[in-house]
Amino acid sequence: MLVWLAEHLVKYYSGFNVFSYLTFRAIVSLLTALFLSLWMGPRVIKRLQEMSFGQVVRNDGPESHFSKRGTPTMGGIMILTSITVSVLMWAYPSNPYVWCVLFVLVGYGIVGFVDDYRKVVRKDTKGLIARWKYFWQSVIALVVAFAMYAVGKDTPATELVVPFFKDIMPQLGLLYVLLAYFVIVGTSNAVNLTDGLDGLAIMPTVFVAAGFALVAWATGNMNFANYLHIPYLRHAGELVIVCTAIVGAGLGFLWFNTYPAQVFMGDVGSLALGGALGTIAVLLRQEFLLLIMGGVFVVETLSVILQVGSFKLRGQRIFRMAPIHHHYELKGWPEPRVIVRFWIISLMLVLIGLATLKVR
């Protein structure tokens, strides 16, 4: 919104022209979300404590987690608020890509909020019934997928970008909708599964968002898009603002979520952030890149699938406990060691993912 205001004021003072620069708005978007998150943190934590919105801990989990019982949860509210306010302030409100991400972010946030509410208020450890959770996730994802397909049909916006091959970009047609659905819903649940230790999910989210900020900038710049042999998408540049807002809000939240955590994001945060990352990947046509950069989320999800599949088929477990971060805890790794090592792996994967853009 401030961009539009600056455009009207620039005739009176040329300095307002700085608001038209994407790099400037990206920086202030990050800082706005960061400071909002830091400002909201103590207030949200205090309010959650007053309302007794404490974390529900499974009795069959690692013993070290029993001390987390009662820690305020649903802190994702401050992440979502910080991102939304920052994006509305610094992004062009006419950009359809921005609204797609915000729609998924808020929509999945509401689904996560209902799930958390049932857990912490109604003391229902299962939360929102799984089929209803997936139903609403699917509805939200399909609305965005069909909307973007209708707008970008038979254009580079619905092509499949294959890593390492610059000349292979098949037109997906209606398969675009199916791919978008699985990426958005899958990423949302993958981040949700990863959110099991203090700060474990938020830092890889920050790394991936930072990586996508660079990709969005290149995709929205015709010269760099042609240089990297990726589709040029004129609306993609504004996703830089969304990505930097996620980075800022994530870092602000980490201030309170780092070990030992003062607050957890809950499903209201993890489902929303995962859905937002999935949507950004789809809009940028970088679903394969998300698999690489979000490798930590992928491995966490695969560990659960393999664990459940192995137990049902063979009656045996592959890991001591799934998701895999619990496996390392039960092997005797201190929680901070698991967290930081997963962060390091995540950073490496993001750098590898960015490098693949040039290897074609």
From Swiss-Prot:
CDD domains the UniProt entry points to: GT_MraY
Function: Catalyzes the initial step of the lipid cycle reactions in the biosynthesis of the cell wall peptidoglycan: transfers peptidoglycan precursor phospho-MurNAc-pentapeptide from UDP-MurNAc-pentapeptide onto the lipid carrier undecaprenyl phosphate, yielding undecaprenyl-pyrophosphoryl-MurNAc-pentapeptide, known as lipid I.
Molecular function GO labels: metal ion binding; phospho-N-acetylmuramoyl-pentapeptide-transferase activity; UDP-N-acetylmuramoyl-L-alanyl-D-glutamyl-meso-2,6-diaminopimelyl-D-alanyl-D-alanine:undecaprenyl-phosphate transferase activity
Domain of life: Bacteria
Name this protein carries in UniProt: Phospho-N-acetylmuramoyl-pentapeptide-transferase
Transmembrane segments: 18-38, 72-92, 94-114, 132-152, 168-188, 199-219, 236-256, 263-283, 288-308, 338-358
Metabolic or biological pathway: Cell wall biogenesis; peptidoglycan biosynthesis
Reactions mediated catalytically: UDP-N-acetyl-alpha-D-muramoyl-L-alanyl-gamma-D-glutamyl-meso-2,6-diaminopimeloyl-D-alanyl-D-alanine + di-trans,octa-cis-undecaprenyl phosphate = di-trans,octa-cis-undecaprenyl diphospho-N-acetyl-alpha-D-muramoyl-L-alanyl-D-glutamyl-meso-2,6-diaminopimeloyl-D-alanyl-D-alanine + UMP
